[in-house]
């Protein structure tokens, strides 16, 4: 694939953020110079927040590995998977579904770390109060959404589409029972805004983003309410390509993993990163934790 085609998957605004640290070495490259380690993340929230967080992460990865590390923003969830597949990206912050999709395209890829909240993650169904839907406590309550408009987040979002759609099916509500075709807002922030403005009566959203939005007083709880919190599931995680060590030097994957697992909220530098991730710490994970996500994705035709 040409470099022009490869770059088309990356967001050009501002270019990639490149961080370099001295003291390390890796294999690959010409003249003994290791190539740049590319990282990215699914664009699940406001780009301003992502552009604050991931350059910080790139800097920490550079310091831990001694490599040149570049954060490469992408335009959408599909672009993350594609960039990972073709090798533009070697480490990516994935959702459960995008991680499963990426592993299916790059066998041998490994989920190396997740946030403490990702082992028991939840989606929320929220609604504009003008819709007249009362909160409920069981999946069967989703039948109350019949005749109402609904938006998901990104088409390949785990918490904003895959699992909400799974629970709609489990609750016995066919999408044809909704008013019109479900929307796809593109991100959790956009879903909340769509419900706030009553562009859609109901939205499926990531609980962590909702909680943060409420804490920042960016949503009026007199007009938007939570209808239901789904059961938990595994979601976000860092995914490493199988050629990470052969490209950048033996031990690179372990150095990155150790850095993530060692982030300490009691240290100011680490807390700044953890706060933007909405977590208290990172914990270990493994590919099998996403077996449920894989099964649901296959059932919904989202894993080609």
Regions picked out by a protein language model, each given a short descriptive name:
Residues 23-30:
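Bacterial lipoprotein signal-peptidase II cleavage site
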Residues 93-106, 167-170, 196, 201-222:
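A ligand-binding cleft/hinge motif common to bilobed small-molecule-binding domains
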Residues 115-171:
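A conserved helix-loop-strand patch within extracytoplasmic ligand-binding domains
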Residues 1-17, 23:
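N-terminal secretory signal peptides and thylakoid transit peptides that target proteins
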Residues 72-82, 97, 178-193:
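Short helix-initiation/N-cap motifs at beta->coil->alpha
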Residues 56-66, 158-184, 214-219:
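Ligand-binding cleft/hinge of the Venus flytrap
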């Amino acid at each position: 694939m040409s470099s022009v085609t490869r770059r088309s998957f990356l967001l050009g605004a501002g270019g990639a953020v490149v961080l370099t640290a001295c003291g390390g070495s890796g294999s690959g490259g010409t003249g003994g110079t290791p190539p740049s380690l590319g990282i990215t993340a699914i664009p699940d929230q406001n780009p301003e927040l992502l552009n604050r967080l991931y350059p910080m992460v790139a800097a920490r990865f550079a310091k831990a590995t001694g490599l040149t590390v570049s954060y490469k923003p992408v335009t959408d969830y599909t672009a993350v998977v594609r960039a990972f597949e073709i090798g533009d990206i070697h480490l990516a912050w994935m959702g459960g579904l995008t991680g499963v999709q990426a592993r299916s395209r790059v066998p041998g890829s490994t989920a190396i770390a997740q946030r403490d909240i990702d082992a028991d993650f939840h989606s929320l169904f929220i609604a504009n109060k003008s819709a007249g839907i009362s909160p409920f406590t069981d999946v069967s309550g989703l039948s109350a959404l019949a005749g109402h408009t609904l938006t998901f987040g990104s088409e390949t979002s785990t918490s904003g589409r895959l699992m909400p759609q799974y629970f709609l099916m489990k609750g016995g509500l066919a999408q044809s029972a909704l008013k019109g075709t479900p929307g796809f807002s593109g991100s959790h922030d956009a879903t909340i805004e769509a419900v706030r403005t009553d562009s859609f009566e109901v939205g499926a959203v990531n609980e962590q983003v909702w909680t943060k939005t409420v804490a920042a007083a960016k949503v009026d709880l007199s007009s938007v309410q939570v209808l239901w919190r789904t059961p938990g599931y595994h979601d976000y995680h860092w995914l490493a390509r199988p050629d990470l060590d052969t490209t950048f030097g033996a031990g690179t994957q372990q150095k990155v993993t150790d850095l993530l697992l060692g982030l300490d909220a009691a240290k100011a530098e680490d807390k700044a990163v953890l706060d933007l991730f909405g977590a208290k710490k990172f914990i270990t994970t493994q590919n099998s934790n996403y077996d449920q996500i894989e099964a649901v994705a296959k059932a919904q035709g989202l894993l080609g």
